[in-house]
Amino acid sequence: MAPNLRKSHPLLKMINNSLIDLPTPSNISAWWNFGSLLGICLTTQILTGLLLAMHYTADTTLAFSSIAHTCRDVQYGWLIRNMHANGASLLFICIYLHIGRGVYDGSYLHKETWNTGVILLLTLMATAFVGYVLPWGQMSFWGATVITNLFSAIPYIGQTIVEWAWGGFSVDNPTLTRFFALHFLLPFMITGLTLIHLTFLHESGSNNPLGIVANSDKIPFHPYYSTKDILGFTLMLLPLTTLALFSPNLLGDPENFTPANPLVTPPHIKPEWYFLFAYAILRSIPNKLGGVLALAASVLVLFLSPLLHKSKQRTMAFRPLSQLLFWTLVANLLILTWIGSQPVEHPFIIIGQLASTTYFIILLILFPITSALENKMLNF
């Protein structure tokens, strides 16, 4: 009998083992859809981004008007731009839900998969940041100035690093050109890291909602989960197109409709909504270096998740106390997101400081203590 090409061809074999004949736990829920959704988001972003780059000019005098030109004169340019801008928001929604699921279900115990995932998150954040600077509006310019300036808090070498990153003594043309180069390059790095992430995942196999070894009961990925993923795509692309077509500027800052002006500072400098939680943590510490360290720690703390897992059970499915803490953490992040969008005045300052403290206390102290307590209660 002739060999099945799908199973014998060197390239098709890899695709087959990853997307067709992959043994998958039979009980994974819709929370396991977000990985494939992130893949679709990334593909959409790269395609729309490529089309935008064809019409974009990375020059301070032309950047703003080149985007206006794209929206007005290019066939469906407005749609491509709106899909790209709002696609970023959707990508972040998916990645935050994906990470939340990982924390809830103890997926971080696949250490290599988890660590590559956190590196992916950091790369994605860098990509989104440099991308936000490209339209060269007021918030683009001042956001770039404020965030890059944080590196000057590094003792001794900080100022040198900032001027090296800027390519001068302020955010100007060299900064814009290099940010465009980086924004073009990083998504391909993300794609490469995604393949590494998947390689590690397929090495150990997927986790599942019960957190038990599922080897005794696995089903092929196709047709079961491929169908389920297509449903996920539809349910995700629907809100994206709705947003891009009906209220494309809902999540943007009106300040960015004004071309960048180094002489006029906007009243409230704030990043896009998906960075507000980290921005709130940064602002809640009055000291510059302290704020920068807290900002870095707010994401890097994810690397510690595998070390802080003290429970004898993998998931939180049967741990009511940890569940309570988990949802408190979610509420806490929503509060931080809200605080990040507010001006620095009473009562927002104290709320932000309390929420920032609670964020770290829950992750670093309460989760391990509660796990140990639950072990005792269950006589483990």
UniProtKB/Swiss-Prot annotation:
Membrane topology field: Multi-pass membrane protein
Principal place of residence: mitochondrion
Residues that bind a ubiquinone: H202
UniProt keyword Aminoacyl-tRNA synthetase present: no
SUPFAM superfamilies reported for this sequence: a domain/subunit of cytochrome bc1 complex (Ubiquinol-cytochrome c reductase) (SSF81648), Transmembrane di-heme cytochromes (SSF81342)
Binding-site positions, heme b b566: H98, H197
Cofactor binding, note field: Binds 2 heme b groups non-covalently.
Membrane-spanning segments: 34-54, 78-99, 114-134, 179-199, 227-247, 289-309, 321-341, 348-368
Note from the entry: Heme 1 (or BL or b562) is low-potential and absorbs at about 562 nm, and heme 2 (or BH or b566) is high-potential and absorbs at about 566 nm.
Protein known as: Cytochrome b
Organismal lineage: Eukaryota, Metazoa, Chordata, Craniata, Vertebrata
